[in-house]
Each structure stands twice: as C-alpha cells, then as structure tokens.
C-alpha cells in the first residue's frame, strides 16, 4: 500500500519532512524484530519498552517511515500523532482492507465469562455450517487452525492481520473477546462490530484502570462505538446486555444500537427460570419474549447459565432459530480451564477453573456448594504485578466458601511470591490456612488429603500451560499436575 494512503487515513497528524515521493509500505509493525525493508514502524510506549528508543534499530533494518508521538532526529519521514497505539489501529484497519466489514463481528466484553461465551457462539455458528473465527484469551482460531496469542485482545496489527486472514479464508462470523485494556488503548478502533455482548462487571484490572468507575467507562466504550463512523450500516447493530448487573442497564444509555437484554430476572427479554444445578449439568426454563423451552445443558453452575444466555442472545440477534441455538448449546461439554473436570477414578472430584477475580472465585465455589456433599478444597493464589486489593478479598472468599482452603502461588511475575501470599493471609487473620509457595506442592497436598466424595477446586490459571516467574514462562499446567496427583491415589471401581 502506498505511504500516502496510510498517511491520509490519519486525520490529525504532522509529517516531517513532508513526503515528496510516494513509495510502497510493505508491512506495519511495532516490533523491531519483525521489521523488513519498506516497513512502517510504529513507536508505541509499552510497559517495559518505549518504541521511540528503538527507532534507529528499525531504520537500520529497513523501515522507511516512522509513526511517533515524541520528537525524533532521523533521516526518514515521521508521522507525528498524539497517540501511536490508536493511530496503529486505524492504520492497520486501512492497510489490511477493513476486513471486519466483510464478516459478522461479535465482540464480547465483561469481567468473567468472555472465553466461554465466545466458544459457545463459535459452536452455534459452526452448527449453522458457517465458517467461523475466534479471537481470545486461549488462542486465535481461523476455522480449525489455532494460532497462539499473548493477550486477550491482541495488538491492533495482529488483530487486523488475523481478521484479514479470516476474511481471505472465507470466514463468515467472528467471535472476539474484547478486554477493557484493549478498549482504552484503542486496539479495536476500526473494527466494525455487529453485535456487542456484555457479560458482567466485577473487580479486576484495577492495577491498570485504578478505579471501578474508570473500569466501567472502559467497558462502555464497546457499546458507545456501535454504529460509529466505521459502521457501514448502524441500523442493524445490537447490544446484548446482562441487565441483572446494574451496569448492563447503564450501558443501555451509551449505545444507539438495538438492545437485547438477558438475565435470570423476569424483566429481561431473554431469561432463565427454575434453575436446577446438578453435579453433571444444569437445567432451567428458557423464556424468549415469553416463549418457554426447557433446557438441559452439560455445563455446570449459575454462572454458566448466564454464559449460555449471552451466547443464545447473540445468536438470536442474528436470526438463528431458537430450537437450533438450544440444540447447539445443549451438546457443549465445556471449555478448557473453565470449570473443567479432571478425569478421576479415585472418588475425588477435581475441577480446574480460571477464576482469578473475587467474583469468579465466588461463582466457582458457590457452584460447588450446590452439589458437594463433603469437604471442598480450594487451591488458590493471586497474580503478581497486578491489582493487590484482590488478594485479601480472594483469600476471604476461599476461607468462607470452602472447608479446606490452601494458598499458593499463581503467576508471581516480578513480585516476591512470599509477599503476595502475605497479602492473602492478611485478609484472613483468624484463619489457619496452609500456605505452599510451590504450586505443584499445593496441588499435590490437596489431592493427597482429599477423600472420596470431596471436591478439589484448583483456581486461577485455568487453561494456562505456564507459570510466569520473573519475566520467564515455565511450563506448568494445573490439569497435568492434578492428573499426576490423582494417579498416586487408589482407584475406586
């Protein structure tokens, strides 16, 4: 693509020196390791590295034009903008030919449930014989091909490149997790969402947003942009909102799109009544504008009823018949690391769950309480370099809602694991909770002690197959560790 086309896509900018001869831009990147001759290098200020400090490296490797927000002394044209991350999103959308406008885009935001909801949506549309794409915490997926991802919502270039690959592969519908951080940083600018889904909002990411008010504002941005200038047709946009959460009602005021509500309360357009949670699944009556159908799903827990309602509403908004949506949802067995049962012949039930927020942990434990008949073990830790105020809250929830809590490390990152655990212990001063810094030991101890009929919840990491210590990822999989510990116990026929 010609440099002039990219420059013209940015309304407010300065180009120094002025471009006298146009040339072809071969690629966009913010990573000097990726730079190829003819690249446009975008200098982004990151958490640990400032791209402006790497501009000379990028030019040495062949970058022909730079996007920056700080003064530079270089011998190639520089496009100066206020915010390079947001500029990157617009440039990527233009460079890759606005791929989101060629597919049905369903964005899902909220504190908990995004991964499960996007996977449920993907299953529904696959059963409609549609080619699907998925972008989220676990991976990016183009039809059946899975690609690794580093963030819930990748950077704008990666996202637009992925969407372009989906478009070129014939994908018709994309289910995409949209994080609050991505919304604030402008990573999804230029993406033309058709349906935006809100799951819930509870405490998370306050290390980034600082306050719940700012966190709420970040989530609201997804709904405010429905029908924005990027939309080819704003009249068919739909906001799918959980109105059991007061924030859902608030978001109604932020969007000009059509609104479809869901929840357990009967005032929601799509709601669930008579919920019955069992050890092997959940049953309820689904009401869609008053039309009631009994649903039996294999997913367990009230929180999964909300996830199912969100996915149902998103599919319903695009015209898929009720009975076909229900058929798809009833056959889903689960998502890796989301209230995932580890195979066991020991009489001990082991569940691995990604619950890394206070509300997520509470949901998981309350669900277990609905069917547990004996002791509940809860192996839980808190991440380092993240919101410290969650630590005492999660510790308190573990102590109050399980009979055998155990505190351990999660991803300590650059923090001292002992200090993280001390923060947790401080939240339950009157409790005597075993503490094992080594997560492997904590899991092994819990499963070794558990007796037939007991339930062991391993919380916090879910699908992750690594543990971050310092800045290094080490292989670690909660499901694998649980399986090893279970193998050492006697089996029960």
Swiss-Prot record:
Keyword Cytoplasm carried by entry: yes
Pathway terms, separated by semicolons: Cell wall biogenesis; peptidoglycan biosynthesis
Residues bound to ATP: 110-116
Post-translational modification: Carboxylation is probably crucial for Mg(2+) binding and, consequently, for the gamma-phosphate positioning of ATP.
Sequence motif: Meso-diaminopimelate recognition motif, positions: 410-413
Compartments (UniProt record): Cytoplasm
One CC-aspect GO term: cytoplasm
Keyword Transmembrane belongs to the record: no
EC id: 6.3.2.13
Entry's Gene Ontology molecular function annotations: ATP binding; magnesium ion binding; UDP-N-acetylmuramoylalanyl-D-glutamate-2,6-diaminopimelate ligase activity
Binding site for meso-2,6-diaminopimelate: 386, 410-413, 460, 464
Assigned protein family: Belongs to the MurCDEF family. MurE subfamily.
Name of this chain's protein: UDP-N-acetylmuramoyl-L-alanyl-D-glutamate--2,6-diaminopimelate ligase
Organism: Lactiplantibacillus plantarum (strain ATCC BAA-793 / NCIMB 8826 / WCFS1)
Source species taxonomy: Bacteria, Bacillati, Bacillota, Bacilli, Lactobacillales
